[in-house]
């Protein structure tokens, strides 16, 4: 047996994964709940504990099935800060704006394990659709000296990748 070191990806104990989604039709809106698991690498946790805020974005795209045409694209932005004087973690949700504090980072990540979306602005006819979702650490908001190393370090690869679920609407909204 021949083994070649370095050719297989290293096992990681961190990353973002999309577990499942739930959809509910309400009066004039499609409610989508994304269930995900977020685990930060040691480098990301160390940066956070040393005053670097982390920005996480969850994106949702509603598409017409088969055509690949995007009908609606929405995202939710989150910012995590460590507050050293109080030893608390602060989670800021950009839209709708809210700020919460938590005693441990695991509590912040548990809060982010469920992300809610409401797609209400555009009427949809009954039919076949797809919901595409991804979550990632948004590196565009990182301090400039950290951006280049983040592009090449495996410790900063926090991206679930796109995941697609089918959606069938029996009645329009």
Question: Locations of the language-model features?
Answer:
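Signal that preferentially marks extracellular ectodomain short beta-strand elements
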Residues: 39, 43-45, 107-124
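N-terminal onset of structured domains
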Residues: 11-54
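Structured domain cores in non-transmembrane regions
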Residues: 43-111
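Intrinsic-disorder/low-complexity, polar/charged segments enriched in Ser/Thr/Lys/Arg/Asp/Glu/Gln
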Residues: 29-31, 55, 75, 114, ...
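Glycine-rich, aromatic-bearing surface loops/beta-hairpins
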Residues: 121-173
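Bacterial N-terminal signal peptides
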Residues: 1-6
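A short, structured loop/turn motif at beta-sheet edges
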Residues: 23-30, 65, 83-87, 121-131
């Amino acid at each position: 047996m021949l083994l070649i070191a370095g050719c297989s990806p290293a096992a990681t104990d961190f990353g973002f994964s999309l577990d499942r989604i739930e959809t509910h039709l309400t009066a004039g809106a499609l409610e989508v709940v994304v269930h995900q698991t977020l685990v930060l690498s040691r480098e990301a946790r160390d940066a956070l504990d040393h005053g670097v805020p982390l920005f996480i974005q969850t994106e949702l795209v509603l598409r017409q099935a088969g055509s690949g045409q995007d009908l609606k694209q929405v995202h939710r932005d989150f910012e995590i800060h460590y507050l050293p004087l109080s030893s608390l973690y602060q989670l800021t949700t950009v839209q709708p704006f809210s700020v919460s504090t938590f005693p441990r980072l695991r509590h912040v990540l548990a809060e982010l394990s469920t992300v809610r979306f409401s797609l209400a602005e555009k009427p949809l006819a009954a039919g076949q659709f797809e919901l595409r979702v991804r979550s990632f650490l948004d590196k565009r908001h990182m301090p400039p000296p950290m951006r280049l190393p983040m592009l090449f370090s495996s410790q900063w690869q926090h991206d679930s990748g796109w995941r697609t679920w089918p959606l069938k609407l029996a009645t329009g909204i």
